[in-house]
């Protein structure tokens, strides 16, 4: 699967927000000038059209979860077929991804690192190996580390970092057993208020 290999902080500056490419423990504001676009004329931000605002919001969320355009559009189509609010359904589908849940638990210090753990068969779902990052986790699922991966220093380091963060209320983590339980699908109020999913729906509805 293709992925972005360029400078991560440049994307944060383009979207004018922290996309959590780093561990999230130390602020990146000193390194990342959010008030400036990347490039030679980054200080000259132009006023965006309605379409531009919608596009930037879509790009921000897509990059936050590390999703390529075609897959992101498929998530939108799936969300539009589900009952309820399409925008909220879209966010829930993204949150239910195994790589994202792995990150939320704290096994990976970033979503990219969590995705790599899943791809390398280090993650178990209900004691079964799952190596598909987009796998949809269900309420009640137990996410743990493969026994051959428990001694990986980076997983332990990520867990130590995650203990400094607040664990999402829809996830229960047992740091001693190195496992997490996906208790429920998050409610919209549980997720970031900085995401405006309605702009994304307006963009794709055109």
Swiss-Prot record:
Instruction: Tell me which domain of life the UniProt entry assigns to the organism this sequence originates from.
Output: Bacteria
Family matches, as SUPFAM superfamilies: Alpha-L RNA-binding motif (SSF55174)
* One CC-aspect GO term: small ribosomal subunit
**Domain S4 RNA-binding as annotated: residue spans:** 96-156
Q: Which InterPro entries does the UniProt record give?
A: Ribosomal_uS4 (IPR022801), Ribosomal_uS4_bac-type (IPR005709), Ribosomal_uS4_N (IPR001912), S4_RNA-bd (IPR002942), S4_RNA-bd_sf (IPR036986)
UniProt GO BP: ribosomal small subunit biogenesis; translation
Q: Which residues cross the membrane?
A: none
The record's Pfam families line, in alphabetical order, gives: Ribosomal_S4 (PF00163), S4 (PF01479)
Q: Which GO terms describe its molecular function?
A: rRNA binding; structural constituent of ribosome
Alphabetized UniProt keyword annotations:
Ribonucleoprotein, Ribosomal protein, RNA-binding, rRNA-binding
Q: Supply the PROSITE patterns for this chain.
A: S4
Described purpose of this protein according to its UniProt entry: One of the primary rRNA binding proteins, it binds directly to 16S rRNA where it nucleates assembly of the body of the 30S subunit.
The text of the family note is: Belongs to the universal ribosomal protein uS4 family.
Task: Give the record's subunit note.
Answer: Part of the 30S ribosomal subunit. Contacts protein S5. The interaction surface between S4 and S5 is involved in control of translational fidelity.
What is the official name of this protein in its record? Answer: Small ribosomal subunit protein uS4
């Amino acid at each position: 699967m293709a992925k972005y290999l360029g400078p991560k902080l440049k994307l944060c500056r383009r979207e004018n927000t922290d996309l959590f490419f780093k561990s999230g423990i130390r602020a990146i504001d000193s390194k990342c000038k959010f008030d400036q676009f990347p490039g030679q004329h980054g200080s000259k931000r132009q006023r965006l059209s309605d379409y531009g605002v919608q596009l930037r919001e879509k790009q921000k969320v897509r990059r936050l979860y590390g999703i390529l355009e075609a897959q992101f559009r498929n998530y939108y189509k799936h969300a539009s077929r589900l009952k309820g609010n399409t925008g909220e359904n879209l966010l829930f589908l993204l949150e239910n991804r195994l790589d994202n849940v792995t990150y939320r638990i704290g096994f990976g210090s970033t979503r990219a690192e969590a995705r790599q753990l899943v791809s390398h068969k280090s993650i178990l779902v209900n004691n079964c190996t799952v190596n598909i990052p987009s796998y949809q986790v269900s309420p009640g699922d137990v996410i743990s580390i493969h026994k051959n991966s428990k001694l990986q220093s980076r997983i332990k380091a990520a867990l130590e970092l995650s203990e400094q963060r607040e664990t999402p209320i829809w996830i229960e983590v047992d740091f001693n057993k190195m496992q997490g339980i996906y208790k429920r699908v998050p409610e919209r109020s549980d997720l970031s208020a900085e995401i405006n999913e309605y702009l994304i729906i307006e963009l794709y509805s055109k």
